[in-house]
Amino acid sequence: MRNQGFTKEDRMNQLPEDLILRILSFLPTELVIATSVLSKQWRSLWKLVPNLEFDSDDYESEHYTFSEIVCKSFLSLKAPVLKSLHLSFRKSVNPVDIGLWIGIAFARHLRELVLYVAPKQTFTFPSSLCICNTLETLKLILGIHVDIPCPVLLKSLRTLHLDSVSYKDEESIRNLLSSCPILENLVVYEYWYNVVNFDIEVPSLKRLEICDVLHKKEFRRYTINVPCLKYLRIEGLNKDFELCLNAPELVEAYFTKGSLIIADKFLGSLKSAKRLSLDILALKMHTRREEWWNLLTVMLDSSPKLQVLKLIDHTQDVSKDNVVSEKWNEPKYVPECLLSHLETFVWIRYDWEREEEKEVATYILRNARWLKKGTISTNPIESKDLEKLEERRKMLNELDSVVRASNSCNLVFEFE
């Protein structure tokens, strides 16, 4: 029995040191340090663990402050390479200490830095902390203020998370992103203050996620120029947001909890996507680009909850005769949004002379079962051009006579 008991107690000590270090790397540093009392072998083993995780709430001591505990841990560390450093501050901590710890971690060839600061606290993340040759992952969360007045260098950074942080200005965002030459993954979750235009121009970026669900009143614009992007997920954009996207290699795109403005620069990027999912209630789409109606079919198929559809032609007097190269083909199946959700349909500067636009308008009126109001406006015609006025009247009468799927639909024609 004694031998059996001894075997059980000594089982952990018989494990390879590399395996023990791997097990310890998944624990908070406080627990890792506590293992030093298990045996003589473990007394110094924790010092080789290449991961440090500190939370100010977990360190309450009558003898040492949180800062002193963290400093002692860094001084005791013997791991030649620090794989990760997670710092969480829910109480006031001297910013100088934070900068010192991060600097020490960079000197230990840090690979991943996660920095969480409680909303009531503020830590300015300066440009001096954005010079690291080994950092591959950087996550900044909540009470962090990004102030980067000039480009820096994070030449190994591949993943960047900006979670509800604030920025000194728009230039700080541009300088941060331009300092990451091989960045592949970017997550932007909300952002605060001093920024109207959020510019994302990262040639190497492959995956982008944006979440902005607070629906603040001020206007915001995301300008995204990402030629290598494969995956895009956007959540929460509302009518006060504008999105300009250049992503010719896009494969997957997901839009949820908001409305979407499809501008000319946006059309080609979405058209290239092989998988498109739109959990949106309102869609505003420009009708200038070549074959825009084929993309409209994709958008309707991908937006089962769509309630408001607005088509806008900004070209006014510019002829579109040379723009179109393909005819419009009706969907094989009526999109779900037309069968069960679409209530409002607006078409600004409807080109009554184009057969394709007539076909699109007719299809929507014939299939939108819950449509309550349709508003169609056309470009102005000079009163002296009687022949053209008569042609327009006939074409609009034809559209007005279309048998509508919704008996309660009120169709209104407006002339600019």
Swiss-Prot record:
Residues 327-378 form the FBD domain. Residues 9-62 form the F-box domain. SUPFAM superfamilies: F-box domain, RNI-like. This is FBD-associated F-box protein At3g52670. It comes from Arabidopsis thaliana. The lineage of its organism: Eukaryota, Viridiplantae, Streptophyta, Embryophyta, Tracheophyta.
